[in-house]
Amino acid sequence: MLSGSSPTTSLSPDQLLERFATGNPRQRRSLIKTVEARIGDLEGLGDGLLAPFDRAGDDWAAGWILQVLHRHRPERVSEVLDRCPGGWFKVESAVGIDYRDLQQDLLQEDFQSADRTTSAVLRQLAGPEAERRGYVYFSEVATMSGGDLTVIDRLWTAYSQGRFGFTTQARLLQALGGRYDLLWPRIGWKREGTWTRYPGAFTWSLEAPEGHMPLVNQLRGVRLMDALLNHPALQQRR
């Protein structure tokens, strides 16, 4: 059984990886900084470093390892991506959308670019009219590819330590009794009664409030956000 003790540098790389890969959420979060501090040791595991994780899933532990490698051992990430040109997490679009840019932005922690890419993909999923007008109507969400919305949510979840993504936003909304007026300040989209100014006042990093990204144009009202969070494909992920 895994202990609840504090992370320790006395763990071997194999032991550290095993704890990070299989621990409960609290244990895994307690190891986030240790994984970064010991990435040199962990890198010595070679291909075994990512072996415990499912490329078809959305395990944020794998996403964090990739982000830490990019921060400190970018050449190692390049080697990994040479073998996975579409990105380490396997994705498949029902409508032919290429998610390499989104996955690369998230891996590199360029969250502002990832957010812009996400908005563009949502317009693509909504159809030519949405692309022409530059935004999505809530009534267009129902016909969006559920598989593609799942891909977007998986990638945001995997590359945010499980803190961003549509399902995270939906979970927070549920915890707040379904009240959007409480959700907006909780996720940092509204401060002291005023909408957060885009893009300068948003926090484009892992230090952002939980649920901060991806953004949805709140000026279009609650209905667009509500339609997205309640899309059947995303409801199945909660």
Q: Where are the regions that the model predicts?
A:
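Structural detector for internal amphipathic alpha-helices that build alpha-solenoid repeat scaffolds
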Residues: 1-7, 29-40, 63-72, 87
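Amphipathic alpha-helical scaffolding segments comprising HEAT/armadillo-like alpha-solenoid repeats
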Residues: 7-18, 40-53, 75-88
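Hydrophobic/aromatic side-chain positions at a characteristic register within alpha-helices
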Residues: 20-23, 94, 106-107
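Alpha-helix N-cap/helix-start positions at coil->helix boundaries
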Residues: 22-29, 43, 55-59, 63
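Eukaryotic acidic, Ser/Thr-rich intrinsically disordered low-complexity regions
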Residues: 58-92
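C-terminal-biased regions
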Residues: 70, 80, 88-96, 100-104, ...
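Short helix-adjacent coil turns
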Residues: 102, 106-114
